[in-house]
């Protein structure tokens, strides 16, 4: 990938993360409560996933947001 393509890819990822964050906040009844849940999950992940290196470029807070949105919007993921 050349430098221009990398910038475009990173830009798209940022927009996806922002969209997912807004989606999570809109779904939630209480923004404060969901923010605390995300922070606690990210803190747990930071210490639990020290040995697991899936993608070191994704910070625990971003991973927590993306996982929580998927869990809420796609409950069939959890039931499987």
Curated annotation (Swiss-Prot):
Q: Which GO terms describe its biological process?
A: DNA-templated transcription
Q: Which reaction does it catalyse?
A: RNA(n) + a ribonucleoside 5'-triphosphate = RNA(n+1) + diphosphate
Q: Does the keyword DNA repair apply?
A: no
Could you give one GO CC term from the UniProt record?
mitochondrion
The protein here is known as Putative DNA-directed RNA polymerase subunit omega
- Locations listed in the record: Plastid, Chloroplast
Keyword field contains Zinc-finger: no
Q: What class of enzyme is it?
A: transferase
Query: What InterPro entries does the annotation carry?
Result: DNA-dir_RNA_pol_omega (IPR003716), RPB6/omega-like_sf (IPR036161)
Q: Which UniProt keywords apply?
A: Chloroplast, DNA-directed RNA polymerase, Nucleotidyltransferase, Plastid, Transcription, Transferase
- Please name the HAMAP family in this protein's record: RNApol_bact_RpoZ (MF_00366)
The protein's superkingdom reads Eukaryota
Q: What is its EC number?
A: 2.7.7.6
The entry sums up its family as follows:
Belongs to the RNA polymerase subunit omega family.
Q: What does this protein do?
A: May be involved in RNA polymerase activity.
Q: Which GO terms describe its molecular function?
A: DNA binding; DNA-directed RNA polymerase activity
**Main location per UniProt?**
plastid
Q: Which organism is it from?
A: Gracilaria tenuistipitata var. liui (Red alga)
